[in-house]
Amino acid sequence: MTNTIIGQVKLSENISQRKSYVTKLDKNKVFYKETGQKIPDPELLKIVEDNPSVFLEKETDDEGNVLKYIYDPNNQNGDGAKKILDSYISGDVPFPNFKVTTIDGEKIELKDLKGKLVIIRFEGQGIALKFNKPIIEILDEKINALVNKEEVEAFIIYQASEDEIRENVELTDSNFKLVANGLKLAQKYYLNQTALTLLIDQNGKLIDIYRNVYKIKLEDHLSN
């Protein structure tokens, strides 16, 4: 599991510039969790000055665009993202839908894949495109070993561009559909690192997040 702290890059030119772990922060989208009110600029600046690594929960659309940041002063212990991911795994909170278009132009939404076991592999860019090829091949072998592989949908969501993927990714007879420019989706799910594999069951519930693909037992989640 990941343990992410979401900070901010900069509130805006007229407030301050600060470094962040993840993304640029639009100060006009930051709200108090308890009241639902927008946080005034001076209060927001004070919050960030007191805690430069402030954790902000995000409300996003299906493509990962941030609609709203939510600040909860009672959830600043460094495990805010882990709590959210754990709530997806426990089933207390539904795993959020996503909408992507593959590099081959196929439009896909998670909610349309009910009844399928879904594998989502998050990958980065640059050298990782070639370096992690053996890991993808291991996952492909696991899928091909199933007697009911048609019950599986598999995706790789890269942070790389489509051109970079087409130039550097060479997968032969792969079960995976490839998605480019996926940084926003990684941030949507509070994933602060790549080379992670998410497994989602037939009801759309997150089973787990895996760093080690050898621990993934697809057959345990499929009918015989």
List the model feature ranges, each with a label.
Residues 1-8:
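Bacterial Sec-dependent N-terminal signal peptides
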Residues 25-29, 42-45, 53-55, 174-176, ...:
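Structural micro-motif
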Residues 30, 36, 72-108:
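N-terminal "domain-start" segment that seeds a small globular fold
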Residues 49-89:
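Mid-chain, structured segments of secreted extracytoplasmic proteins
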Residues 79-81, 199-224:
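Thiol-/selenol-based redox modules, centered on thioredoxin-like
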Residues 91-93, 106-139:
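Short active-site neighborhood of thiol/selenol oxidoreductases, capturing the structured segment around
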Residues 101, 177-181, 210-211:
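Short acidic-hydrophobic, aromatic-tinged amphipathic segments that line or gate anion-handling sites
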Residues 155, 163-203:
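Short, internal strand/loop/helix patches
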